[in-house]
């Protein structure tokens, strides 16, 4: 099971083994100045993703999207599991990017080698063309969101939301809170699924505590039968 980013058992709850906050280690400036340090923790995330598989929650969301063509998925996850589970790419917004493939920070070459093989080599991984440092297409701390993903989110926000299902996030960023506020302002339904209460809980019409893999398949099956 992959750890959450914040909250109970979260990856970003403390300092790293190197004595710096994870937000510093996994930042754009650190990747530029100390690529080996940044890649130490990128590799930990990468290896955890490679060991894991999409769970029942991912498949339940994908099935719901197939049944309801107007349903969009906004995810902060960078593991690519929603694609693997079958969520339609045209209605999937990966706002923080995806771990693979890597590209060269110097020449821009896209590296198609498997991520697993690159993580087995000395870090940071290097470009086969120019020996520059490779990086994933993910949003590190202190970096801008990808323009295309942000534009798609803004377009859907302008259209509005009848209902928002918030799963496994503390919604620490304004762009994650935006759909929740939009739904609330228009009288829409907000349902939260999380291991523990969060700052979102007072905004939700219904808060369900539990693992997404356990809750989502039952919840969406119940909604589908109505």
Language-model-detected regions and their locations in the chain:
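Conserved catalytic core of sirtuin-type NAD+-dependent deacylases
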Residues: 1-226
């Amino acid at each position: 099971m992959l750890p959450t980013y914040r909250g109970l058992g979260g990856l970003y709850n403390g300092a790293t083994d190197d004595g710096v906050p994870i937000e510093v280690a996994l930042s754009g400036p650190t990747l530029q100045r100390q690529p080996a340090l940044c890649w130490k923790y990128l590799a930990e995330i990468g290896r955890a993703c490679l060991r894991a598989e999409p769970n029942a929650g991912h498949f339940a969301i994908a099935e719901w999207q197939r049944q309801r063509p107007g349903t969009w998925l906004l995810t902060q996850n960078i593991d690519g599991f929603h694609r693997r589970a079958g969520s339609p790419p045209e209605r999937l917004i990966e706002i923080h990017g995806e771990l693979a493939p890597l590209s060269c920070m110097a020449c821009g070459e896209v590296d198609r080698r498997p991520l697993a093989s690159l993580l087995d080599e000395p870090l940071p991984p290097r470009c086969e063309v120019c020996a520059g440092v490779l990086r994933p297409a993910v949003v590190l701390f202190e970096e801008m969101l990808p323009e295309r993903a942000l534009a798609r989110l803004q377009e859907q926000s302008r259209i509005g939301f009848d209902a928002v299902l918030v799963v496994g996030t503390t919604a620490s960023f304004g762009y994650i809170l935006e759909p929740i506020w939009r739904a609330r302002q228009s009288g829409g339904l907000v349902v939260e699924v999380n291991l523990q209460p969060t700052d979102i809980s007072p905004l939700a019409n219904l808060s369900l505590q539990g693992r997404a893999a356990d809750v989502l398949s039952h919840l969406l099956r119940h909604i589908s039968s109505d």
